[in-house]
Amino acid sequence: MHISEKGLVLIKRYEGLRLKAYQCRAGRWTLGYGHTHNLNIGDVITQEQAEAFLREDIAQVTALLNTQIKVPLTQNQYDAICSLVFNIGMTAFTTSTLLKKLNVGDYSGASAEFMKWSKAKVNGKRTPLPGLIKRRQAEKALFESA
C-alpha cells in the first residue's frame, strides 16, 4: 500500500513546516515536515527540499509497514498508522503492542493503543503533550473511520 493525499495532509498538519532546523519539545533537531536525519544546527532548506525529505521519509515508513503488517487494512487505517509511525519512529512501532494486536486481527485493540503514544520525554521525564494528544486523537479517529 501507499499513503494517500489525506494521510500526507494529516502528517503535514501536525508536523508543520519549518525551513530552519529547530529543536522540538522532545529535544530532537528537526527540519521541514518532521525530518530528523543528518541535520546540523542552523540548517536551512526550501519548501521543495522539505517536500523531497517528506517523500523520502514516508517511503521508509511505507516500506516498513508493507513488511510488518500482516492483516488487510483500509486506506484510512493505513494512513493513520503511517502518521503514527512517522512521528514515533520505526523501531518503536515494530516493538509496539499496537502492531501485535493489529497482526492478530484485533483492530479495536490496535485502535485503543494510539493514545498510549501521546507522551514524549521532556527534561528526561515522559510528559503528555497537548499536540501529541490531538494528533493521536486524529489518527485514532481516521483509523476507526475505515
Curated annotation (Swiss-Prot):
Query: What enzyme category does the UniProt record give?
Result: hydrolase
**Compartments it resides in:** Host cytoplasm
Q: What is the lineage of its organism?
A: Viruses, Duplodnaviria, Heunggongvirae, Uroviricota, Caudoviricetes
Q: Which gene encodes it?
A: 13
Return the InterPro entries for the record: Bacteriophage_GH24 (IPR051018), Endolysin_autolysin (IPR033907), Endolysin_T4_type (IPR034690), Glyco_hydro_24 (IPR002196), Lysozyme-like_dom_sf (IPR023346), Lysozyme_dom_sf (IPR023347)
Q: Which GO terms describe its cellular component?
A: host cell cytoplasm
Q: What are the transmembrane regions?
A: none
Please give the function described in this protein's UniProt entry: Endolysin with lysozyme activity that degrades host peptidoglycans and participates with the holin and spanin proteins in the sequential events which lead to the programmed host cell lysis releasing the mature viral particles. Once the holin has permeabilized the host cell membrane, the endolysin can reach the periplasm and break down the peptidoglycan layer.
What PANTHER family is this protein classified in?
A: LYSOZYME RRRD-RELATED, PTHR38107
Q: Which family does it belong to?
A: Belongs to the glycosyl hydrolase 24 family.
Reactions performed catalytically: Hydrolysis of (1->4)-beta-linkages between N-acetylmuramic acid and N-acetyl-D-glucosamine residues in a peptidoglycan and between N-acetyl-D-glucosamine residues in chitodextrins
Q: Which UniProt keywords apply?
A: Antimicrobial, Bacteriolytic enzyme, Cytolysis, Glycosidase, Host cell lysis by virus, Host cytoplasm, Hydrolase, Viral release from host cell
The active site is formed by E15 (proton donor/acceptor), C24 (proton donor/acceptor)
A Gene Ontology molecular function term for this protein is:
lysozyme activity
GO biological process, any: cell wall macromolecule catabolic process
Instruction: Provide the protein name.
Output: Endolysin
Record EC number: 3.2.1.17
Is Hydrolase among this UniProt entry's keywords? yes
Gene3D superfamilies (UniProt xref): 1.10.530.40
Pfam families, sorted: Phage_lysozyme
Q: Does the keyword Hydrolase apply?
A: yes
